[in-house]
Amino acid sequence: MSRWFPSVQAIRSTKLETFVQVGLAATLVLNVWVNPAVAADPFRTKEARNIGDKTEAAFKAIFQQGDYKAAEAYLQQALVSEPNEPLAYAMKASLAYTNKDWTTLDTYSKKTLEMGQKLIASDPLRGNIYTAVGHFLEGAALVRRQGTVNGATQALSKLQEVYKYLDKAEAISPNDPELNLLKGYMDLMLAVNLPFANPQQAIERLDKNAGPEYLADRGIAYGYR
């Protein structure tokens, strides 16, 4: 994994800030509600997971209707009726980042990590995926609290944890569309924002195994820009 992590001195502060911002945007993009016919799972046509009605409604409010106020209301309900769904907490954290609400970002990044870790026992694939997402969001919160330069070392440590858990998920189901979409996007964000990195491997991952197809294609297009 060391090939993903150049020295802190090699990272330009503006690049790291860009990575955090684009990566959080990617976290939102990857959770788009795509196909209502697929058991609340926009990624899989086999072994689909249910994420809960309120979380689903929040997806629709954000990505179909652009109604963030309604989405916040649905997410508040989801935290009560679907308290073990880490995606609800991840969306709360991502919306907090969008709203520059750093206290809420800090709170829900920690909850995303906690719920992801809890999910590992019953769904190791998604549990490891969202444990990785939780570490990513915590890294973003660190950068916001401490600044890009002061928070760089800890943020990179978090990034190592992100890939540790994504690798665990990949060991369980290497061709899983949700995993490959998320990991493909994160690899891509690193490749285009850090020096000496090549986006080709990320592009190939998105092309071969990620789903849904149109989001994979969006990532591929970004990689070729």
Name each region found by the language model.
Residues 2-4, 21-24, 28-98, 106:
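N-terminal leader/linker segments that initiate helical-solenoid repeat arrays
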Residues 11-13, 117-121, 215-216:
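Intrinsically disordered, low-complexity coil segments
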Residues 41-44, 50-53, 62-69, 92-168, ...:
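Short coil/linker segments at helix-helix boundaries
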Residues 88, 127, 179, 212-216, ...:
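TPR alpha-solenoid repeat register
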Residues 182:
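Aromatic-lined carbohydrate-recognition surfaces of secreted/lumenal glycan-active proteins
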